[in-house]
Amino acid sequence: MATLQQQKIRIRLKAFDRRLLDTSCEKIVDTANRTNATAIGPIPLPTKRRVYCVLRSPHVDKDSREHFETRTHRRIIDIYQPSSKTIDALMKLDLPAGVDIEVKL
């Protein structure tokens, strides 16, 4: 019995700026919908919060510290039944430099 394997592209996006990430997701979903592919998402994943603790004084005061944090926002978009037009359109898509994109076929 042969199973019907469905083609799928999974796109994982990461960024420090949430607004940049959301506009990139909108562009990807619009591009997929224009080429008659089915786009599911963007699905928000948990935000990673990284806190750095730094001494304020270069010399002795260990009691005085400062905290900095970075937040990494993540999204997943699944594109089902992509055609060659879909892949070409996604490759030509101009996205901001602050967004990390990972594509799995």
Swiss-Prot record:
Gene3D superfamilies named in the record: Ribosomal protein S10 domain (3.30.70.600)
Record keywords: Ribonucleoprotein, Ribosomal protein
GO CC annotations on file: ribonucleoprotein complex; ribosome
Name of the gene this protein is made from: rpsJ
Record organism: Gloeothece citriformis (strain PCC 7424)
UniProt KW Nucleus keyword: no
Family as reported in the entry's similarity comment: Belongs to the universal ribosomal protein uS10 family.
PANTHER family from the UniProt entry: 30S RIBOSOMAL PROTEIN S10 FAMILY MEMBER (PTHR11700)
Biological role stated in the UniProt entry: Involved in the binding of tRNA to the ribosomes.
Protein name, as recorded: Small ribosomal subunit protein uS10
Annotated GO biological process: translation
UniProt GO molecular function: structural constituent of ribosome; tRNA binding
Record flagged with keyword Acetylation: no
Subunit structure, as described in the record: Part of the 30S ribosomal subunit.
